[in-house]
Amino acid sequence: HAIESIVEEVESSKDSIVDTLERAIQSANRYIRIKSRENEDMNGMGTTVVAATITDDVMYVANVGDSRLYIINSGIRQITVDHSLVEEMVRMGGINRQQAREHQDKNIITRAIGAEDELKIDFFKVKLEKGDFILLCSDGLTNMIEDEEIRMLLLGQKDIVSKAETLVAAANRNGGKDNITVVLIEPFADEVNK
């Protein structure tokens, strides 16, 4: 239901994109908080979110937790910032990126939908270019495949469905310890393929 409430809010709103995303994610947060109070089996439940909407050549991104959004073209660029204990350690200089990938606490997130009554959401605005691919994914992918390998796997496939399937298969081959969510968007597909 949390996903449906975000989609409904975005589709029906007349407000700015950022305000709409904020309201939609806060609404999903309230829903999860209520459900976790009503049902003891759901106590403490939470989730991460990465959401994007595109208008012309501008993408607006919202994230909470450690699900990520990347732009892939000639390189790979992570747009979102993980809300995790190890990301804080990296930012403070305590560990490097490789140590973060292998750290025992890499799955401890510092923000999640459902964790707090008032949720802090990060927003990003990105200009897109022809040839860009957008990847939204869970940590089930990024814990199993490094960024450069993600880029190489995407470049090795022609169609977008094969690209997504290849990423999931590679994550599973590398251990697939968590749920693996992959959403690929090719915003200028019609223009590029002409």
Q: What residue spans do the PLM features occupy?
A:
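PP2C/PPM-type serine/threonine phosphatase catalytic domain
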Residues: 1-194
